């Protein structure tokens, strides 16, 4: 089934966030998840390896927070970074 425009946009946001998380952890984004996996996440499918094991710890839980509006890519003087509501340093 085709994604809705909103699901496509959410997948793009998740992909951006995944790239930032991967860069932060010095790992290739593809080692964490494929775009297909992110599309599944954007459609509400929670049965993905991205939410389990080391992938879940490194990226999955944060990506769920992105979907809930608790984390988002932020533009800063040093470029893009992923900021979360509980990370006080992202507010300054």
Task: Label each PLM-derived region with a short phrase.
Residues 1-92:
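Accessory DNA-binding and partner-docking regions appended to nucleic-acid-acting proteins
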């Amino acid at each position: 089934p085709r994604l809705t425009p909103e699901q496509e946009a959410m997948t793009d946001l998740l992909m951006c966030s995944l790239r930032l998380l991967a860069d932060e952890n010095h790992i290739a984004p593809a080692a964490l998840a494929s775009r297909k996996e992110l599309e599944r996440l954007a459609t509400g499918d929670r049965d993905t390896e991205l939410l389990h094991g080391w992938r879940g710890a490194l990226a999955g839980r944060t990506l769920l927070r992105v979907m809930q509006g608790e984390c988002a890519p932020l533009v800063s003087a040093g470029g893009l970074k992923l900021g979360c509501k509980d990370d006080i340093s992202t507010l300054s």
